[in-house]
Amino acid sequence: MKKTFTGTCLFLFMTITIVSCTESEASLGNEAKPAEIETETPATNASRIERGAYLVEVAGCHDCHSTKIMGPMGPQPDPEKLLGGHISGPATEKVDPALIQKYALFNHATTMAIGPWGASYAANLSSDESGIGSWSEEQFINAIRKGKFKGLENGRPLLPPMPWPNIAKMTDEDLKSIFAYLKTTKPVNNVVPPPTPLEELVKK
């Protein structure tokens, strides 16, 4: 009887020990495998360029920043000078001051606009050094976010009709994608003239 009791106790002790070891190993196994943290995969440059090209199209950047040639349905972007900005030189015509208090005037290429602010000319956004070829990504984002010429803190404000307050609502990734695409565009060597003050345009 005593032997039977002793054997039973030994069996129970061994069983408890085995279960305890198994649970400890399982616990160690769980500690060895920390929960995986999901991270956002950064966009590749190729995917950024592709998205940037799409955004430039749907945002209508060619409407003002690409000079036009006459096509069968009217003015259309000149494929040889895409995003090269205003090319025709500064405004020389005198305008009626009463007219520009009511209307904004555009040239046929829609790269120049005249209004109460004077005459503004669409910037060269091509990859040429006379465009944004020498710009940094930070400059480009600052230009859009803050409405500053060339993204410089002490730069002049961007003038109408540039809709920078709307574009500023794009995400950082959107703006980085646009910049990546613009850096791949055909370079258009074209120095855009500075804005013309209103007093130089008004008929005396």
What are these regions (language model features)?
Residues 70-142, 158-171, 201-204:
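Gly/Gly-Pro-rich "capping" loops immediately C-terminal to redox-active cysteine motifs
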Residues 1-9:
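Bacterial N-terminal signal peptides that target proteins for export
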Residues 134-149, 164-194:
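C-terminal capping alpha-helices of c-type cytochrome domains
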Residues 52, 58-68, 140, 178, ...:
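The canonical Cys-X-X-Cys-His
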Residues 49, 62, 155, 161-163, ...:
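Interaction-mediating elements
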Residues 32-57, 69-75, 91-95, 134:
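Electrostatic cytochrome c docking/interface patches
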Residues 17-20:
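C-terminal motif of bacterial Sec signal peptides marking the signal peptidase cleavage site
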Residues 22-24:
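Bacterial signal peptide processing site
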